């Protein structure tokens, strides 16, 4: 059961993947986690990735593809995986097809969490984080008991720079410009399934399970 999760920042991909990996018994793999693992392992690939990220640049496709191939070759992926944050481009989608072909597998589902720009802005721009313990709040869906203070440690809550409305709108536009063609790529191959990402978490999980278990 090989699955790709697609959707703009704030669509909830990571949240859904964490729930579904427990239900389905397959790993949740994100590009961010893969990069961090390589860096922690101090591998040659990890050193290259670390240098690129320190310069504030995007990790190029060829390097990302190698890391993805290595991760998907591990034993825990034999029964399947949920891939989150990759592919971001049509070139990466084609590379993933080749990687899976060499492993004797194929992608079964590309699940697109459709969320409007306004919903994404509302979700992300209302996010607040504790400066002390890192607990995450949302002023609308998960507000602190005392405004501006962490429920756990009493630390001050702050808004990340890239969570500001104007930045979120820019990130949404970048996603739609660069990654939306991937959605069309999977639509043409009849692997795309669209889920309303503005629903509550339980409803989204139920819908994804309905798609997978049809």
UniProtKB/Swiss-Prot annotation:
GO terms for biological process: AMP salvage. Its main location: cytoplasm. Its EC number is 2.7.4.3. Residues 126-163 are annotated as: LID. Disulfide bonds: none annotated. Residues 30-59 are annotated as: NMP. It catalyses: AMP + ATP = 2 ADP. It is an enzyme of class 2 (transferase). Pathway: Purine metabolism; AMP biosynthesis via salvage pathway; AMP from ADP: step 1/1. One of its GO terms (cellular component) is cytoplasm. It is found in: Cytoplasm. Keywords: ATP-binding, Cytoplasm, Kinase, Metal-binding, Nucleotide biosynthesis, Nucleotide-binding, Transferase, Zinc. AMP binds at residues 31, 36, 57-59, 85-88, 92, 160, 171. It holds the Pfam family ADK_lid. Consists of three domains, a large central CORE domain and two small peripheral domains, NMPbind and LID, which undergo movements during catalysis. The LID domain closes over the site of phosphoryl transfer upon ATP binding. Assembling and dissambling the active center during each catalytic cycle provides an effective means to prevent ATP hydrolysis. Some bacteria have evolved a zinc-coordinating structure that stabilizes the LID domain. PANTHER family: NUCLEOTIDE KINASE. Catalyzes the reversible transfer of the terminal phosphate group between ATP and AMP. Plays an important role in cellular energy homeostasis and in adenine nucleotide metabolism. Belongs to the adenylate kinase family. This is Adenylate kinase. It comes from Thermosipho melanesiensis (strain DSM 12029 / CIP 104789 / BI429). The gene is adk.
């Amino acid at each position: 059961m090989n699955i790709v999760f697609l959707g703009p920042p704030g669509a909830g991909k990571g949240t859904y993947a964490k729930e579904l990996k427990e239900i389905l018994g397959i790993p949740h793999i994100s590009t961010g986690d893969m990069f961090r693992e390589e860096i922690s392992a101090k591998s040659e690939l990890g050193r290259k990735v670390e240098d690129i990220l320190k310069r504030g640049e995007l990790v190029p496709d060829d390097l990302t593809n190698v890391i993805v191939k290595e991760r998907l070759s591990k034993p825990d992926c034999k029964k399947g995986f949920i891939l989150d944050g990759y592919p971001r481009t049509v070139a990466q989608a084609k590379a993933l097809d080749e990687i899976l072909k060499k492993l004797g597998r194929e992608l079964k589902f590309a699940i697109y969490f459709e969320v409007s720009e306004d919903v994404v802005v509302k979700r992300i721009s209302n996010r607040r984080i504790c400066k002390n313990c890192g607990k995450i709040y949302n002023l609308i869906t998960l507000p602190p008991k005392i405004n501006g203070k962490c429920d756990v440690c009493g630390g001050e809550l702050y808004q990340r720079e890239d969570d500001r409305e104007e930045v979120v709108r820019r990130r949404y536009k970048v996603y739609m410009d660069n990654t939306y063609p991937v959605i069309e790529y999977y639509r043409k191959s009849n692997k795309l399934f669209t889920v309303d990402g503005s629903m509550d978490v339980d409803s989204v999980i139920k819908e994804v399970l309905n798609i997978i278990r049809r």
